[in-house]
Each structure stands twice: as structure tokens, then as C-alpha cells.
Amino acid sequence: MPITLLGPRLADPGTEFVYHGPADDCEGCPYRQQCLNLTEGVRYEVTDVREGGQVLDCAVHDEGAVAVDVEPTTIPATVPSKGAYAGSKGKLAGPCPHTECPSHEFCEPAGASFDTEYQIAEIDGEPPHDHCALDRDLTLVEFAPAER
């Protein structure tokens, strides 16, 4: 399980984030090796906060940074219903301009891209919307965690 550094506001078990790589302010930081050891574009979940560790100075996080355990996590997403079952591969249906839709966060989920096929780990059922404005027949699924 990878150990990385996060700001205290994010350092809670269950918090999920997508690692986007180093910020410009990371240049020259003495903690780069411990902090920038994740895979870009992967969604992670904080599983534990290291107790007794000190808060390190950090140019990115205004309250400093603390050591946490993280692991790649599933990505809740909507996929076309046809052929969607646990164990199969699935892709996102495509971009959606309807940001007010209750399913939008699943149609364009953080940590997933439109041009990638993902392993479906689990079927969650019907998406939260009553009707898709793009007339898509969608199923809510969990994409398997990314391989490290």
C-alpha cells in the first residue's frame, strides 16, 4: 500500500482523490520522493493516517502535509447498459453537457477517460436520473481499481 503526503484537510480515511502529478510549487521540495510516488490519473482512497508523524512544510497545502496510506479505488460510472455485467469491460458513453443532471458525476467521473476500456467490478443498478437527456440507456457500475 503506497504512502504519500496530503494536506490535513484531505487526510481522512475514506477521502478519495485523483492524482494529477506534481504542481509547479513541488519543484525543489525535499519530500518529492515520498509525495509524488502515485500514478497520474488514478483515483485513490485514503485508508489510514499515519499517527505520530509530524506536519511537514508544504508549498501546495497551506496547512502543511501529513503521511497517509492510500490505495487505488473503484470509480463509480455509468456505461451503456448493453453488455454491462460484472467482469466485462466497459467504456463511458461519451461527454455530456447536462451538468445539472444527477447522473453527470457518473457520466464524466473523476479518474476515468472516455477513450479507455475499464473492467467492471460491480453493477450498482439504475443511475440516479429519471430520464437521460441524450436518450442513452445507462447502467451504474463500479470500474475496478487501476493496476499499479
UniProtKB/Swiss-Prot annotation:
- In which domain of life is the source organism classified? Archaea
What family classification does the UniProt entry report for this protein?
Belongs to the UPF0179 family.
What this protein is called in its record is UPF0179 protein VNG_1401C
